[in-house]
Design a protein with these regions (language model features):
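Bacterial Sec-dependent N-terminal signal peptides
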Residues: 1-27, 238-241
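Short glycine/proline- and aromatic-enriched beta-strand/turn motifs that initiate or cap beta-hairpins
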Residues: 21-79, 239-241
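Predominantly the C-terminal beta-signal and adjacent terminal strand-loop region
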Residues: 27, 173, 187-241
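Gram-negative (and chloroplast) outer-membrane scaffold detector with strong preference
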Residues: 29-38, 46-52, 87-161, 235-241
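Residues that define the transmembrane beta-barrel architecture of outer-membrane proteins
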Residues: 36-40, 78-82, 127-133, 147, ...
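Flexible, solvent-exposed loop segments that connect beta-strands
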Residues: 54-75, 107-128, 161-171, 207-226
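Short conserved catalytic/interaction loops centered on acidic-Pro-aromatic/His motifs
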Residues: 146-148, 165, 169, 190-194
Length: 241
């Protein structure tokens, strides 16, 4: 009798387990989509531009007042910009892809200069429209039903198309750096959508010290206040592939 009870309980548990497993396993959309040798897509989102500043701390004589002034620069706040671009993806293996994602990122950086002794303040906004060319390796986890997390890492170069001369600050047009990020692919019946966050860390100094473009030399003190400025950017995007 006990054997029959155990057998019935065992069959019941087996059936219930199979039912639960069937509930957790869903029909996979685009089951072979990740195995294409190459594919293309678009990316669209927001960016927040920043800059890692190194102040010189050196005093300078104001040509108008004759006073000695020491200015320090900060970026006190951030405003969102717009990013749009293309995606070219090359399959390497089931867990790794090589990606080229050229994009345009429109935005600005708000600088505030504060004079140390007299507490004078000066604010200016520098517009930066970056044509970016990142090359990344995309490393993916195992796919679970219709989503698949991933991380990215790579390098980028960028050309600033929005620079204007005769401004309080002049930035060099070219910069380069490294990128890291993460996201998650969501597989829909005919398209794959991925929310992604990307961190871009510049490596070169873009503050132009040779200000031959200035017509108002009283602005030179703001360039002199900085010895180094390295761009940084956070980009939130949705990728459609």
């Amino acid at each position: 009798m006990n054997k029959k009870v155990y057998l019935i309980l065992g069959l019941f548990c087996l059936l219930e387990g199979s039912n639960l497993f069937a509930q957790t396993q869903k029909v996979k959309n685009q089951p072979y989509g990740d195995y294409k040798l190459y594919h293309f897509g678009i990316t669209i989102g927001l960016n927040f531009q920043d800059m890692l500043l190194t102040n010189s701390g050196l005093p300078a004589i104001n040509s108008e007042t004759g006073k000695e002034e020491t200015w320090f620069a900060t970026i006190p706040n951030y405003s969102p910009g717009f990013t749009v671009g293309l995606i070219a993806d090359l399959f390497l293996n089931p867990y790794m892809n090589l990606r080229f994602t050229p994009s345009l990122s429109f935005g600005d950086k708000a600088f505030e200069f504060v004079e140390q002794e007299f507490s004078e303040r000066f604010k200016t906004t520098i517009r930066s429209n970056y044509l970016m060319a990142p090359v990344d390796v995309k490393i993916r986890s195992m796919r679970l039903n219709n989503y698949r997390p991933y991380v990215i890492a790579g390098a980028f170069s960028a050309l600033d198309l929005g620079l204007k001369k005769d401004e309080p600050l002049l930035l060099k047009p070219m910069n380069y750096g490294i990128t890291i990020g993460l996201g998650c692919d969501f597989y829909l019946p005919i398209i794959k959508i991925a929310p992604e966050i990307r961190f871009c860390f510049g490596l070169n100094n873009v503050v132009e010290k040779n200000r031959t473009d200035l017509t108002d030399f009283s602005l030179m003190k703001y360039s002199d206040a900085l010895t180094r400025g390295v761009p940084r950017m956070i980009i939130f995007t949705f990728n459609f592939e």
